[in-house]
Amino acid sequence: MAGDSDSKLDNHAENEHVDWQPFLIGVAGGTASGKSSVCGKIMELLGQNKIDHHQRQVAILSQDSFYRVLTPEQKAKALKGQFNFDHPDAFDNELIVKTLCEIMEGRTVQIPVYDFVTHSRKEETVTVYPADVVLFEGILMFYSQEIRDLFQMKLFVDTDADTRLSRRVLRDISERGRDLEQVLNQYITFVKPAFEEFCLPTKKYADVIIPRGADNLVAINLIVQHIQDFLNGGLTKRLNGCLNGHTPRKRHPSESSSRPH
């Protein structure tokens, strides 16, 4: 019967949608190791950084967006450079897990925006639409097993301590309104010990270690090739679905991979 046939096609199409999942890549490494630069280079080599947002197949998220909301006492400490932002408890892991699960289900998600000058979440959020590949970078991306196990590929950006410190000093002074003494005190008191205790031990979970960060084009090109193979395989699967009368995942023309809300 036509009704039964239509029902079977609908069910099959629904199953095709359920079977589809984005490729989640975790990118960890010490502070100012070049995680964002590596993600940006991957986007560039994939040709994703200069195309229309609604055609973008790759999205980038940062663990920095998921700092917990501080109490008044914690915020007062933070403004004096006395709060440890490199400790696992500084991050809202529950929200990270919830966001990643929604991304895996192909949903549009709202990402918090963190203000590093005032140490607070802004009222606005960033809208991230469904993408085929999602890069999620942060200093402690692999610390929580629950989060770590969600990634199909794990990268660790390995940069020497002197380079990371010099980059952090320049960044925090120019972008975050800190003075040199505060940056150095925070590094010695919190950043360096936290790296050695919480971040560095997670290096063992990485599938690929990238020395020298974005300067290591050999490693990045290998990763890009792997992502391209995934994207091409996904495209073939969706095209086959169309040929068989199934409906692939669609994105509204007005949707972008990431934009302010």
Swiss-Prot record:
Residues annotated to bind ATP: 29-37, 215
Gene3D superfamilies found in the cross-reference section: P-loop containing nucleotide triphosphate hydrolases
Transmembrane region(s): none
SUPFAM superfamilies named in the record: P-loop containing nucleoside triphosphate hydrolases
Binding residue positions for substrate: 86, 114, 119, 168, 178, 186
The entry's keywords: ATP-binding, Kinase, Nucleotide-binding, Transferase
Presence of keyword Kinase: yes
Catalytic activity: uridine + ATP = UMP + ADP + H(+); cytidine + ATP = CMP + ADP + H(+)
InterPro entries (UniProt xref): P-loop_NTPase, PRK/URK, Uridine_kinase-like
GO BP terms, alphabetized: CTP salvage; UMP salvage
Keyword ATP-binding: yes
A GO molecular function held by the record: uridine kinase activity
Family listed: Belongs to the uridine kinase family.
Subunit structure: Homotetramer.
Protein name as it appears in the record: Uridine-cytidine kinase 2-A
Gene (UniProt): uck2a
